[in-house]
Amino acid sequence: CPSMTVRENLSLALNKGKLLNLRKCLRYKRDFLENLLEGVSLDLKKYLDVQVKFLSGGQRQSLSLIMSCLTNPSVLLLDEHTAALDPKTSNEVIELTNKIVREKNITTLMVTHNLKHALHYGDRLIMLHKGEVVLDVKGKEKEQLTVEEILEKFEYAV
């Protein structure tokens, strides 16, 4: 919620699914919440008492990602979650995504038009065109692909 602080948003996310008022949610100690944000490269730790509406796009995306993974979901759906970010921030958010997904072992479906990200992250790459699967690779085959080869396969398929 943009009008709430980072701390308030994290506290609510930690209590997802529980019928608690905000005051009870805020029982989480500052050091606990700071520890949650440890290692997040966009300095979110310094902004615990700042309203979300004052954060940068990358900070908001990082906060959303962290909040969505606090309750250990079985599946995480990401739809172009770095598309509106500058390249540097996009890389920071995608690295945070990779770290969280790997540490928590969360099955993730990531939609992206960034072919480098599509190649580098994840165990399987599925490319669609007009709702049809035109490429489905995993394992060694995926590891050996280049961006240029993906583009060639796409052009051949369409």
Protein language model features and the residues they cover:
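Q-loop/switch helix immediately C-terminal to the Walker
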Residues: 4-16
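Hydrophobic anchor residue at the start of the ABC signature
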Residues: 65
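ABC ATPase C-loop
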Residues: 68-69
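Catalytic Walker B motif of ABC-type/P-loop ATPase nucleotide-binding domains
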Residues: 76-79
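Helix N-cap at the start of a conserved alpha-helix in ABC-type nucleotide-binding domains
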Residues: 87-89
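Helical segment within the ABC ATPase nucleotide-binding domain
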Residues: 91-103
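H-loop/switch region of ABC-family ATPase nucleotide-binding domains
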Residues: 112-113
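Conserved beta-strand-loop-alpha-helix hinge in the C-terminal portion
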Residues: 132-155
